[in-house]
A protein has these predicted regions:
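Conserved NTP phosphate-binding and transfer environment spanning the P-loop NTPase/kinase superfamily
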Residues: 6-135
């Protein structure tokens, strides 16, 4: 099992990279260097890695804001269980997920068409339906 936030992510069309989606992209990547580099890696190196996956299961969140809330909840739980570990503030969590926003939203659009199984999650992180895709 190979698990991760953006496992299986595909590259975007160059034209889709032009408009900054969030504060990080608008203020720190105005020349598109980071976006183009990530996109190139998704198109080449990561594609080669992801092509080795036998079956792809996609856990689809209801929306990107829900992902922020879940990540914040994860941080709050970490705070309770790890007394000596440093955790992120709400601001830092929001900033952290901005780095993954573009890829995540791109995946949310049509990833269920390429995954072998998409599990649609409700706001409470429970499975509400599943969709199998026959390739």
């Amino acid at each position: 099992i190979f698990e991760g936030w953006c496992v299986g992510a595909r590259n975007q069309k160059e034209s889709d990279l032009k408009k900054g989606l969030n504060k990080i992209e608008k203020e720190h990547d105005s020349k598109l260097q980071w976006r183009k580099t990530v996109n190139r890696y998704l198109k080449n190196q990561y594609k080669n890695l992801f092509n080795k996956i036998d079956k792809l299961v996609y856990l689809k969140a209801p929306n990107f804001n829900r992902i922020f809330k879940w990540r914040l909840l994860q941080e709050e739980k970490l705070k309770l269980t790890s007394k000596n570990k440093k955790t992120m503030s709400k601001y830092k969590v929001r900033e952290f997920i901005m780095f993954y926003e573009r890829i995540t939203k791109h995946m949310m659009k049509d990833f269920s068409k390429i995954s072998d199984l998409t599990i649609f999650l409700d706001n409470s992180h429970r499975s509400k339906k599943m969709k199998f895709f026959n390739k």
